[in-house]
């Protein structure tokens, strides 16, 4: 059992190869601001979590860049229904790719940190939009029951 955990929780490599050094530095700085608030005391764990988070930003950027290139091509070269179909296909491909890697991120983090810390990372990445949107909705619809509020919060959390 320990052998599998040790192999799974090995050092995380930063996916910086071929990336603009200034972009890498910017992503690391953004990621450090989030990771620094988690209370991680072990330097190796902190670095692994930092690299997982930075790699997530890189992966998200890569996915959106592919989509943007396909949309740009469609707008420049195609016309009419073909153009619209290519744009929609690029969006669907982006969504499918995002869905496929959606669970990979918290699973990787869970090797090093607990669920509360994972939620703190997600909140940091989304600028606490979960709480902001939830509180705004509850303020706009004061007639919500506690059960409805719990369900809405669960939906927002899942969407995050």
Task: Enumerate the predicted regions with their spans.
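Bacterial Sec-dependent N-terminal signal peptides
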Residues: 1-17
